[in-house]
């Protein structure tokens, strides 16, 4: 099945402590059905010191389940569902179902 959310997409968080926040997808983990979104779902990690980095409490992003995020509509900025359509030149592209605007290409 084609990926509805890809690296670099602008997304909106639908549920949880970061509801309504917007960010870019840094990485997608299809086997886990999760994605890493920049600046969202921040957690504190206790890291041991290593030769390259000092230890301490580090704040970083945690993975978010794909069901809790939606693509940001390119036209309105609101969360939208994603559909697929084939263009006249034969390319398969994603489009926002709310506005009909193509997301990639």
From Swiss-Prot:
GO cellular component, one term: ribonucleoprotein complex
Entry-linked Pfam families: KOW, ribosomal_L24
MF GO annotations: rRNA binding; structural constituent of ribosome
InterPro entries: KOW, Rib_uL2_dom2, Ribosomal_uL24, Ribosomal_uL24_CS, Ribosomal_uL24_KOW, Translation_prot_SH3-like_sf
Gene3D superfamilies: 2.30.30.30
GO biological process: translation
SUPFAM superfamilies hit by this protein: Translation proteins SH3-like domain
Keywords noted in UniProt: Ribonucleoprotein, Ribosomal protein, RNA-binding, rRNA-binding
Subunit structure: Part of the 50S ribosomal subunit.
Stated family: Belongs to the universal ribosomal protein uL24 family.
Function, in words: One of two assembly initiator proteins, it binds directly to the 5'-end of the 23S rRNA, where it nucleates assembly of the 50S subunit.
Name of protein: Large ribosomal subunit protein uL24
Organism annotation: Parvibaculum lavamentivorans (strain DS-1 / DSM 13023 / NCIMB 13966)
